[in-house]
Amino acid sequence: MLPDLTTLSDFRNALAQAPGADADARAACEDRNGQLTKPPGALGQLEEIAIWYGSWRGTARPEVRAPQVIVFAGNHGVTARGVSAFPAEVTVQMVANFKAGGAAINQLAQLADARMDVHALELDRPTADFTQGPAMSEEDLLAALRTGWNAVDPASDVLVVGEMGIGNTTSAAAICHALYGGEPGDWTGRGTGVDDEGLALKTAVIAEAVALHGSRDGLEVLRCLGGREIAAMAGAIAAARVLRIPVILDGFICCAAAASLARLHDQALDHAVAGHQSAEGGHQALLARLGKAPLLSLGLRLGEGSGAALAIQVLKGALACHSGMATFAEAGVSDG
């Protein structure tokens, strides 16, 4: 069961006290993997993710039966600075598209036999322009974290979180710049497709915001530079950690949300793998900072949870091999 969150301290404490993976299940998965009818390591990363998944689900022969995809939507005050190629009303329009089943994520979630939920977070009340002050109050941050926290179905067995929010690549890049330093341009991509002039403006806005707020702990960075949908993703990822539900991370924005948790606790993302490496500037460097190797690299930069939802199929393939293959003894094959 998830504890209730009434303060930000509750969130910090729940994450710090979250249980780890099942060591006995991991050992059993490794033992089984060593007996399957293949050369050691021949299935590469598929072997690693099957063992990882089994250790979090507590069984040597795991299966995915109840995947959940959650898409969070929020609007950003920083869009007033001209950092996006699309107007903020597109967020509302895309939420309607999600609910009607017309977006890419709807098709990929359906393909994965995943439950899909959509949560719109106060779209008529954008976050504040974070070049002028914090994006959110502590109350707003807690409310967004709680939305994500409570959105996770405890009966799900793998979680994907996605987002929709015009301006949120600017927010994600600012979070990464605040957490990891470097140059603002290291973390800044074209998002919805800004031109060179727009990219230069976006980079300058990020530099201005981080100079104003500085580098703080994960929740303060999220409060000052994040969006409601980004905070909700962080809340959902943290809830899954407490519930020992494996998570497949999506692209740059999702991983920026995850990075705020990693700053809070070193083991906060042990239950997560990277579904893909997106084409958005900064994602490759962010994955390296998080120590996550992507399962896919297809040049995606859509968001919505699309790359991670597609990676559910990779996970299912890994588990089909791990749980369904015969051992050398069962098949009567010499193991050399």
Curated annotation (Swiss-Prot):
One of its GO terms (biological process) is cobalamin biosynthetic process. The active site is at residue 304. It comes from the Bacteria. CDD domains: DMB-PRT_CobT. Pfam families: DBI_PRT (PF02277). The keyword Glycosyltransferase applies. It catalyses: 5,6-dimethylbenzimidazole + nicotinate beta-D-ribonucleotide = alpha-ribazole 5'-phosphate + nicotinate + H(+). Keywords: Cobalamin biosynthesis, Glycosyltransferase, Transferase. Pathway: Nucleoside biosynthesis; alpha-ribazole biosynthesis; alpha-ribazole from 5,6-dimethylbenzimidazole: step 1/2. Its EC number is 2.4.2.21. HAMAP family: CobT. Catalyzes the synthesis of alpha-ribazole-5'-phosphate from nicotinate mononucleotide (NAMN) and 5,6-dimethylbenzimidazole (DMB). Belongs to the CobT family. This is Nicotinate-nucleotide--dimethylbenzimidazole phosphoribosyltransferase. It comes from Ruegeria sp. (strain TM1040). The gene is cobT.
